[in-house]
């Protein structure tokens, strides 16, 4: 494209102008000394250079043809190298902007039931940041060039700054969008998500250039008055406020609900008043998307709460998808993959894509892939450091610490374990029994003694006698305690207690509990607790049913689940119904209920498990006695007494025969979601923390790999030849700009301030080089600005938009910001420069004069072509195309050719008017 424009400009320079002036030759330069001279009436470029803001004139000022060619090459190469420098410092500048706009605040959300949760949301509104700092970052060279040109030339209006702003707007509107349309893979399309915001920014973009024409050619032709300049500057915050109101659905949006649809015949978007919308395209919600209330969100509430809930849902969906792809990995292993996946697929800012494009072009590597590799390297030593350190001491404890026995068992055996240590010492540890509800002498035999662990021994057993009786009684328990550890050498001789590291110690559990179960009763059946909290990620929950106060005979115990707020049948849990059979002397059984894991961030549903009446099986004489009723034979007194005792011993339900199970969100899953939300802040990816990190990045060459893997598992490839070439071409700028303060300092503002000063310095050099290049080859500043300077400042944005179009699921980041930045360029770039100059000349009592013809013609031409471009983009939202970007091959190629053609026509007509081949205003 650039070569075509250069050929066109060369032909224009060779053709005779409409005014009939003689064509200049190298040996006889034209009389005007600078463009300000020719701007009043001349149609040819000047061959006589004037001092710039920073660069002096290259003497002698009347060189030969060969010297002119050499100078032109030097100026052009220097200008290109300066553009590379601006791109790299803009990388730092945009990183600072990303850190500033990514600043978060904590919010407390109160739900309907009174519970509160704390989360973090961004302070900066996305639309406001895109139109202010983001637009300033991407358009800083154009804006600063306009300001520096006016201030550096005695507050005289120039052609380079305004021409660059209009030319850059044309390049962004036509070439950048054409590239974005073409690079979308076949069969795919991208739509603008925030269409209301796009309408507002597009309208302001058109209005900005219409307003520019009005103040140049209608209100006060050839003069910019103070009120016109100041009003141009004031339009910038007004534009931001209108875009913010559209994004927040203020004004009439809050009073009227509209349902939008596309007419199948005409493709026109139709709105109708009605119920609250479930899916509105203008809201940025794709057709078929679930409403917030349907997603278990917070419903109506603050925008911050809905934003936080949406972030959580995105992370949860990512974890669900990764679990299906990698069922063999646990949650901790998925965190790293999920972090990379979330960073890769989340909607990114204009700053990120600008930084990504610059680093890929300059051999600095893929931002996300380098971040994932650095995170993996940091995690490896952290995992090793997390392992428990052994102090070398032996640990002595009960294993297990809970024991159950029937009262007719005679004795119970307890186990004591010696674990760890060097194994070359002898340990003496005392034990003794302690009463609980069971009493020594009546329920068990009191015991005390000493256990001796010789070198190499790891386990000892001690036996406690149990006393049996024929009295029906509740279950009872007593304790056995370990105490008084002494250490001996290998021969068993006691060692003095030194002040160094101990060779052994008693650790929990030091106390063993022994429960004596009565064997004179069939048992009381119940759950251990009335309430059981389970995590939804458990899969299957094991519920224990205990048999206390006896364990005689075989008992069958029915059970079933009952719905509460949780629903069975596979919704929240699987229904369970059956029977547990307790054998003789069996005191515990486990039933299982399967929990469905739907991975919700917050959850609290309940259901119940109920026990039925126990049935006594294989009861022997007791069965006969209990089954005998008022038959033909009356029971004897002995049989009546036996029946009464048997009736007392039959199985019954205990107090806890109904268990409430509360299904809650997984604590680990919730922590993982919160951790990922914090990690997916792009400011952590592109920001820097120290000068050391910046200098290491500056001297390191990495592979410029644009293709992303969803799990980041592909091995990092070696840099290509292009990566090495670009790295060595730009290593001077990289090392120089590594001196800029890291983005972590002062929350990014230190980097912001230093970067914009450096960009201003380089922009002043670019302006001088462009002017000297133009006067050397006889190219007017207006044409030079539209072709070369606008192209140089917009190349990084082109690559950034291309990456955004390929990686984002919507078109906002790639083309949605084009219209906003075009408006900001006029309101800030020309508003600031012209306000300063108009006020200066008003104080001097003179008007601020601006040449009307070329600039007014370019503005009008761009406005007409922009109307055509925006209309085509809106037409492409018809169903058969699918969106502003991509679509079927035929419409895609046709639209790309149309936009490129509009840009070439703009260059052609602007150049023809500048050289008087056609009449302007």
From Swiss-Prot:
It is found in: Cell membrane; Basolateral cell membrane; Perikaryon; Cell projection, Dendrite. Ca(2+) 4 binds at residues 443, 469, 473, 476. Residues 1-20 form the signal peptide. GO terms for cellular component: axon; axon terminus; basolateral plasma membrane; dendrite; dendritic spine; neuronal cell body; perikaryon; plasma membrane. Residues 384-483, 512-612 form the Calx-beta domain. It catalyses: Ca(2+)(in) + 3 Na(+)(out) = Ca(2+)(out) + 3 Na(+)(in). It holds the Pfam family Na_Ca_ex. NCBIfam families: caca. Mediates the electrogenic exchange of Ca(2+) against Na(+) ions across the cell membrane, and thereby contributes to the regulation of cytoplasmic Ca(2+) levels and Ca(2+)-dependent cellular processes. Contributes to cellular Ca(2+) homeostasis in excitable cells. Contributes to the rapid decrease of cytoplasmic Ca(2+) levels back to baseline after neuronal activation, and thereby contributes to modulate synaptic plasticity, learning and memory. Plays a role in regulating urinary Ca(2+) and Na(+) excretion. This is Sodium/calcium exchanger 2. It comes from Homo sapiens (Human). The lineage of its organism: Eukaryota, Metazoa, Chordata, Craniata, Vertebrata.
């Amino acid at each position: 494209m650039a070569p075509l424009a250069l050929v066109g400009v060369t032909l224009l320079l060779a053709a005779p102008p409409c005014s009939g002036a003689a064509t200049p030759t190298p040996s006889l330069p034209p009389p005007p000394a600078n463009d300000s001279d020719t701007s009043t009436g001349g149609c040819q470029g000047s061959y006589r250079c004037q001092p710039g803001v920073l660069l002096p004139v290259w003497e002698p000022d009347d060189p030969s043809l060969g010297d002119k060619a050499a100078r032109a090459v030097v100026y052009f190469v220097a200008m290109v190298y300066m553009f590379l420098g601006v791109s790299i410092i803009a990388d730092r500048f945009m990183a600072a902007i990303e850190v500033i706009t990514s600043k978060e605040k904590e919010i407390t959300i109160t739900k309907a039931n009174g519970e509160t949760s704390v989360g973090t949301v961004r302070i900066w509104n996305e639309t406001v940041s895109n139109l202010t700092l983001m637009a300033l970052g991407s358009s800083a060279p154009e804006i600063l060039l306009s300001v520096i040109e006016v201030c550096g030339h005695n507050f005289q209006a120039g052609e380079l700054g305004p021409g660059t702003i209009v030319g850059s707007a044309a390049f962004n509107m036509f070439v950048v969008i054409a590239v974005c349309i073409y690079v979308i893979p076949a069969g795919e399309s991208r739509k603008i998500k925030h269409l209301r915001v796009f309408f507002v920014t597009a309208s302001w973009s058109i209005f900005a250039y219409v307003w520019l024409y009005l103040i140049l050619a209608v209100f006060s032709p050839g003069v910019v008055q103070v009120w016109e300049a100041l009003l141009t500057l004031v339009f910038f915050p007004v534009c931001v406020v209108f875009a913010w109101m559209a994004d927040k659905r203020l004004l009439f949006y809050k009073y009227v609900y509209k349902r939008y649809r596309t007419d199948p015949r005409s493709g026109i978007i139709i709105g109708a008043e009605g119920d609250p919308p479930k899916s509105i395209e203008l809201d940025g919600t794709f057709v078929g998307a679930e409403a917030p209330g349907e997603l278990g969100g917070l419903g109506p509430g603050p925008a911050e709460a809905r934003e936080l809930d949406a972030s959580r849902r995105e992370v949860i969906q990512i974890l669900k998808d990764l679990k299906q792809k990698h069922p063999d990995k646990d949650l901790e292993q998925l965190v790293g993959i999920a972090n990379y996946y979330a960073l890769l697929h989340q909607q990114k800012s204009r700053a990120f894509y600008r930084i990504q494009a610059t680093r890929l072009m300059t051999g600095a590597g893929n931002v996300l892939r380098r971040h994932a590799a650095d995170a993996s390297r940091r995690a490896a030593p952290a995992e090793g450091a997390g392992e428990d350190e052994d102090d070398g001491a032996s640990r002595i404890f009960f294993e297990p610490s809970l024991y159950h026995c029937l009262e007719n068992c005679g004795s119970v055996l307890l186990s004591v374990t010696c674990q760890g240590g060097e194994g070359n010492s002898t340990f003496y540890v005392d034990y003794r029994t302690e009463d609980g509800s069971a009493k020594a002498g009546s329920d068990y035999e009191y015991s005390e003694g000493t256990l001796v662990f010789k070198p190499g021994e790891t386990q000892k057993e001690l036996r406690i006698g149990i006393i049996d009786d024929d009295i029906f009684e509740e279950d009872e328990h007593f304790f056995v305690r370990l105490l008084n550890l002494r250490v001996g050498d290998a021969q068993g001789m006691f060692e003095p207690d030194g002040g160094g590291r101990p060779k052994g110690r008693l650790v929990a559990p030091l106390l063993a509990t022994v429960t004596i179960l009565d064997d004179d009763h069939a048992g009381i059946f119940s759950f251990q607790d009335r309430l059981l909290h389970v995590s939804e990620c458990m899969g299957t929950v094991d519920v224990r049913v205990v048999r206390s106060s006896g364990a005689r005979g075989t008992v069958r115990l029915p059970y079933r689940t009952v719905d509460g707020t949780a629903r069975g049948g596979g919704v929240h849990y699987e229904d369970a119904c059956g029977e547990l059979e307790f054998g003789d002397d069996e005191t515990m059984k486990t039933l299982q209920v399967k929990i469905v894991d739907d991975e919700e961030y917050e959850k609290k549903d309940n259901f119940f498990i109920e026990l039925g009446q126990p049935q006594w099986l294989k009861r022997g004489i007791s069965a006969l006695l209990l089954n005998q009723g008022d038959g033909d034979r009356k029971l004897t007194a002995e049989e009546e007494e036996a029946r009464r005792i048997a009736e007392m011993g039959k199985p019954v339900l205990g107090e806890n025969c109904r268990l409430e199970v509360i299904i809650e969100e997984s604590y680990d899953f919730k922590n993982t979601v919160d951790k990922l939300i914090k990690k997916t802040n792009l400011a952590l990816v592109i920001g820097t923390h120290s000068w050391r990190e910046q200098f290491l990045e500056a001297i390191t060459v990495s592979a410029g790999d644009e293709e992303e893997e969803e799990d980041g598992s592909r091995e990092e490839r070696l840099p290509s030849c292009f990566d090495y070439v670009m790295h060595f071409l730009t290593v001077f700028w990289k090392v120089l700009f590594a001196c800029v303060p890291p983005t972590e300092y002062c929350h990014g503002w230190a980097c912001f301030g230093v970067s914009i000063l450096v960009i201003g310095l380089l922009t002043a050099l670019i302006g001088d080089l462009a002017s000297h290049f133009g006067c050397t080859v006889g190219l007017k500043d207006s044409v030079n600005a539209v072709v070369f300077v606008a192209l140089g400042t917009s190349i990084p944005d082109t690559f950034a938009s291309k990456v955004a179009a390929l990686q984002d699921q919507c078109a906002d980041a790639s083309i949605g910001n084009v219209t906003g930045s075009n408006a900001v360029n006029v309101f800030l770039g020309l508003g600031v420069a012209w306000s300063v100059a108009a006020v200066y000349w008003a104080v001097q009592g003179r008007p601020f004069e601006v040449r009307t013809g070329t600039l007014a013609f370019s503005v009008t031409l761009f406005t007409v072509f922009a109307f055509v471009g925006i209309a085509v983009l809106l037409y492409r939202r018809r169903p058969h195309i699918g969106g502003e970007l991509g679509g079927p091959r035929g419409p895609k190629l046709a639209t790309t050719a149309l936009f490129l053609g509009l840009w070439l026509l703009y260059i052609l007509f602007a150049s023809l008017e500048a050289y008087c081949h056609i009449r302007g205003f």
